[in-house]
Amino acid sequence: MNLIKDDRCMLAENLVRKAGKLGLDYFNRIDELQIDRKGHQDFVSEADRALEGVIRDGITAAFPKDAILGEEVGYSAGLSDYVWVIDPIDGTTNFVSGIPTWVVVVALVCNSRVIAGFIYDPIMDVMYSGYDGGGAFRNGVRMSVVALSLIHISEPTRLERI
């Protein structure tokens, strides 16, 4: 199966982008956000809930039998072999602090195996996607790794007091 053109994968990419654009709107008016504390250094905002809602609604409309596991709402059982895993704002602490290093993340699982993942950075407008057996992409361009035959380990340098 070519996962890149799979209906679920195309939907995931579209929903992650849509949620990211909504997240950017919230981020640009961060002072107006309702922010709750879930635990020490663990926050949830109305933006987290709204972004997860956009993603959940899109999944449910297109694939009503799929299960969904979201960070904010939790697990919704399904009847198919698919589970969608959602982190609507990965980096909520940064988000609520006005630090522009947060992303929207969705993974697609089939028969207990992760088959695709999508990470969207709306600040930089960069989409990362990866497919089981199909490679990884940045904005649709295949990413590659550099083959290294030897990794050089630097010697420690003593820093003298200035």
Regions found by a protein language model. Give the residues of each.
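N-terminal subdomain of lithium-sensitive/metallo-dependent phosphomonoesterases centered on the IMPase/IPPase/PAP
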Residues: 1-89
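Conserved catalytic motifs of the protein kinase core domain
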Residues: 81, 101, 113-115
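Short beta-strand motif preference
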Residues: 84, 104-106
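Glycine-rich, Arg-bearing micro-motifs that act as flexible, cationic patches
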Residues: 96
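Acidic beta-strand-loop-alpha-helix segment within the catalytic core
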Residues: 106-154, 158
